[in-house]
Amino acid sequence: MRELTFEDARAASMGGLVFGAGGGGLERGLEAARTVFQVGSPVLVTLDELEGDDQVMIMTGVGAPGTQQQLVWPRDGLRALELACEAWEGHGAIVGTMTAHPGAFMAGTWLVNALDPHLAVIDCNANGRGHPTVAMGGMGLAGRTDINVVQAAVGGVEDHHGHIEIVARGPIGVVSDILHHASAATGGVLLASRGPFPVDFLREHGAVGAVSACIRLGEAMLQAEGEGGEAMIGAIKDTLGGRELGRGPLRSANVAVRENWDVGTLEVDSGSQLVIHVCNEYMAADIDGKRVATYPDLIVTLAESDGMPTPAAHREPGERIVVLAVPRDKIPLGAGVREAAVYRDPERLLGIELVAHAGAS
């Protein structure tokens, strides 16, 4: 157990930006982190420090990350957690919270831990990298119809489709589809909470050490900050053990919202035909028609100028970018990405094969 600092939050936000493949919005994430440390000092706890039957809640978002209008606020995340805890009828102590996956927003979710010293930040995620569907963060439960989990979602604004609160109990896959449709109805995004999950389950099925991994990467990035794009690119690549797939001007960015997912392709003029397939996350990369990386490999696009990642929806044709890929065995992953069923929607939306390359069954 250790007390987290704002420097940890800065590092977690920077590292989370990469593990989230650019999603989350760094400035907004840092602003939320500042609020956290104005309120209190959360503590980071590893799973090894907890009892097996201790319970952990997940905090996450649902919807399209490219949504531009702010439709959710920190209070919505706190309310979702409150609703999920109230609806839980199990036994054991709820000792902490964790995020579903990393992003620049990660430290902002520590607000509840700063407000309530009895809730620790747990050094685990449902998945240690961004994922396009809640089912991928289901830690292996997406296809289980015999296990019911409480999920709550809150968000929206009154003058834009209205504000909603939803609480549901049922199989993760079914309820996740309901929340995704609800996020579309409110304009694009909701803040959500689900669980709780016992520590013994997280030790086997969660992305153990995901928070520490973000902080380590972020610390390397902060050291490279101000040293130029190549220094930042090198810090990210070397820390994660990744490789460069190519670099050059972005030839096209055909990404649009479909069924409340950001879907499409990016094409990079790297001297070869480098195509990145997008479904909220970078799901696959092809060079001259040959697959070179597939989710859950981490594919990241970095601006050549400063080495920083930005999401697919914000890339502009002509911008010079660098494409990195990090092998899946170098990333903390949850069990959910190994389920073939969770790739159904991305495969359908993209029209490409993922399961055969993803090592899922």
PLM regions and their residue ranges:
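N-terminal low-complexity or amphipathic/hydrophobic leaders
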Residues: 10-61, 307-329
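Short glycine/serine/threonine-rich phosphate/pyrophosphate-binding segments
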Residues: 26-30, 78, 100-111, 128-132
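Glycine-rich oxoanion-binding loops at beta->alpha junctions
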Residues: 50-93
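A structural-propensity feature for long, helix-poor, extended segments
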Residues: 51-66, 136-182
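A short, small-residue-rich loop immediately preceding and capping a beta-strand
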Residues: 92-101, 120-124
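Short, acidic/small-residue loops that bind anionic groups at enzyme active sites
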Residues: 115-135
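Oxyanion-binding "anion nests"
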Residues: 213-268
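C-terminal non-catalytic interaction/assembly regions of soluble proteins
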Residues: 253-361
